[in-house]
Amino acid sequence: MSSTIFETSREIVSIEKVDEIPRSKSIHVFAICITSDNKPIIAARRTSFVFQEIMSQRKSPTSTLKVSKNLLRYMYNNEIKEISRRLKKGIILINNINSSFEELILLGGKINKSESVNECLQREIQEESDYHLTVKCFGQELIKISIYDKLFEKKYISYCKICHINETLSTILSFKLYNVEIRELKSLIDCSNNDKYKYLFFIYNTLINSK
């Protein structure tokens, strides 16, 4: 099947419809969640992928860091402060950084060996929402998402489907989350200024309109 390509300042994303998800190691599945009043829901990650990658490259917990200025625009302010504290030399002026950054993701994760796709999604959606979201049903259509991370030259492949949930948008936006991964649930429609918005909306629109 043909694929649609999106390119942002940090990613090249290929999206295509598929008929099934292969069963192999390290398969990741995600969902565009649809509220009972038909609004698409995504999540804001508590930690940016850039900060996570930088910290994973440390030789020790107390290592000093050398960080490209280009990476700072893809981190939260508290992470930039932590990076600044560990720099080999100099400091980072937070006032010069775009404070509106937000790391958007879809709910989901890695399939455990004994799980089906839907079982994995149900578990991940419950865990990442602090058990506030309850699943009504899953859609049948599938999309394969291939992402090339231009910042760190890494490639990721995942799969996505629709998940209908029982809660309304207003109820979901009132939730306070305390888990380690997700800081907030959000309406996708409200995130049009985010660098991932165009391809996330394309995924949503493709899945919701598939026959």
PLM-predicted stretches and their roles:
Residues 12-21:
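Short, basic/aromatic recognition patches
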Residues 8-11, 50, 98-108, 113, ...:
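Nudix hydrolase/Nudix homology domain
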Residues 21-27, 153-155:
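A short catalytic or substrate-binding loop motif that flags glycine-/basic-rich loops and adjacent residues
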Residues 2, 21-22, 192:
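Compositionally biased low-complexity segments enriched in polar/charged residues
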Residues 147-149:
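Extended charged low-complexity segments that act as oligomerization/scaffolding linkers
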Residues 28-35:
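Short beta-strand scaffold segments in enzyme catalytic cores
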Residues 39-127, 131-132:
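Conserved Nudix-box catalytic region and its N-terminal flanking loop in Nudix hydrolases
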Residues 132-143:
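A short coil-to-beta-strand element that immediately follows conserved catalytic motifs
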